[in-house]
From Swiss-Prot:
It catalyses: sulfate + ATP + H(+) = adenosine 5'-phosphosulfate + diphosphate. Its EC number is 2.7.7.4. One of its GO terms (molecular function) is ATP binding. Pathway: Sulfur metabolism; hydrogen sulfide biosynthesis; sulfite from sulfate: step 1/3. This is Sulfate adenylyltransferase. It comes from the Archaea. Signal peptide: none annotated. It is an enzyme of class 2 (transferase). The keyword DNA damage does not apply. Belongs to the sulfate adenylyltransferase family. InterPro entries: ATP-Sase_PUA-like_dom, PUA-like_sf, Rossmann-like_a/b/a_fold, SO4_adenylyltransferase_pro, Sulfurylase_cat_dom, Sulphate_adenylyltransferase. PANTHER family: PTHR43509, SULFATE ADENYLYLTRANSFERASE (PTHR43509:SF1). Keywords: ATP-binding, Nucleotide-binding, Nucleotidyltransferase, Transferase.
Length: 380
């Protein structure tokens, strides 16, 4: 079955950096699990048009303008940070073997440049703040002092694990969408288990499109977020019990949450365009954290990127109204807050921590049970 060609990858070409390069004798460094995920995402075209880690010109353009040096939309810097000792060694190396934490050589980096960067300027450019209470800012300030730019060649997948079983490449998703006969696909980005309002939102999107691609983020998250295994198992359970056959596809996206609000909303849209999605759901405070962003900023930023082929679908918050007897939105429901079953992430976490099953209007019973059965459903 041919790949879904209803939407082109960002930049026009789906990157493929998977090769058979011989790494024998190369200087090697070990990178974090999150950086290893970035390398694999580059290789598979999830980060198209990137073919490697950003060089200085592209890096500075991204943090100052939200675009690559060639003016193509790109809002989140994909970089490899190293300490001074490693940087000095890499300056003299043409090719470097990148090993994941398991010691597996996953890729060869073709070193093009090694450069320093201003951490405060970077944090301000990406996150809009230098407040270290923001997890993205704290991460940026903890980065090593040098960045290495260059293309990568991916040579070996990491070991298979349970959490990787739903990881799909853009080639695989495009083939799956084509096989299902889908021409219009709405992506749903999430870092949480599905509550019923999200289910209703996804099903609403299906009514005018061929299918929905549920794409949870798997990777490092902030304390208090749900752990990856819980998120995936909850979605598997909900899809099994509550979705029409051949209308929902689940695939995990292995990348670190940045909590960059509007900038990350654009990044999320670009990745889902590369997967073959024609639309993406963008809710209030998409990819936000705390009170750092205006709730509508993640929707408003799309007016700065009209050239994106993927179309954002803006939804207000859904809730259950006891008088309307349905899930609805503030635009459609005239009733008082006392009649509304609102969804509070804080309240939901407190209920689960106390072993209480949330209301069926908040979580499907089967989904709630998955969470309650897990010994440690939250990130420490």
């Amino acid at each position: 079955m041919s790949e879904n060609d209803s939407i082109k990858p960002h930049g026009g070409v789906l990157v493929n950096r998977i090769t058979n390069v011989d790494p024998s004798g190369l200087f090697s460094i070990t990178i974090s699990e999150d950086l290893a995920n970035d390398v694999e995402n580059i290789a598979d075209g999830i980060f198209s048009p990137l073919e490697g880690f950003l060089g200085q010109q592209d890096f500075e353009s991204v943090i100052s303008r939200g675009r690559l040096a060639n003016d193509l939309a790109w809002t989140i810097p994909i970089v490899l940070d190293v300490d001074e000792e490693t940087a000095n060694k890499m300056k003299d190396a043409v090719d470097v073997l990148l090993q994941n934490p398991d010691g597996i050589g996953i890729a060869v980096l073709h070193v093009e440049e090694v450069y320093t960067f201003d951490k405060e300027k970077t944090a301000k450019g990406v996150y809009g703040t230098n407040d270290t209470a923001h997890p993205g800012v704290a991460y940026t300030m903890s980065m090593k002092d040098f960045l290495v730019g260059g293309k990568i060649d991916f040579i070996q997948r990491p070991n298979d694990t349970e959490i990787r079983k739903n990881r799909l490449t853009p080639k695989q998703t495009r083939e799956a969408f084509a096989q299902a006969g889908w021409k219009t696909i709405c992506a749903f980005q999430t870092r949480n288990p599905p509550h019923v309002a999200h289910e209703m939102l996804q099903k609403t999107s299906i009514t005018t499109r061929d299918g929905v691609f549920v794409n949870p983020v798997i990777g490092k998250k902030k304390s208090g977020d749900f752990v990856d295994e819980v998120i995936v198992k909850c979605y598997e359970t909900m899809i099994e019990h509550y979705y029409a056959e051949n209308r929902c596809k689940l695939g995990t996206l292995h990348t670190q949450m940045k909590y960059a609000g509007p900038k990350e909303a654009i990044h999320h849209a670009i990745m889902r365009q590369n997967y073959g999605c024609t639309h993406i759901i963008i809710g209030r405070d998409h990819a936000g954290v705390g009170k750092f962003y205006d709730p509508m900023a993640a929707q408003e930023i799309f007016s700065d990127y009209p050239e994106l082929d993927i179309a954002p679908v803006f939804f207000p918050a859904f809730f259950y109204c006891r008088k309307c007897l349905t899930y609805t939105t503030p635009k459609a429901c005239p009733h008082d807050n006392d009649d509304k079953e609102q969804i509070s992430g804080t309240a939901l976490r407190e209920m689960i921590q106390n072993g209480q099953a949330p209301s069926q209007f908040i979580l499907r019973p089967e989904v709630a049970q998955v969470i309650l059965d897990h010994p440690k459903p939250f990130v420490d």
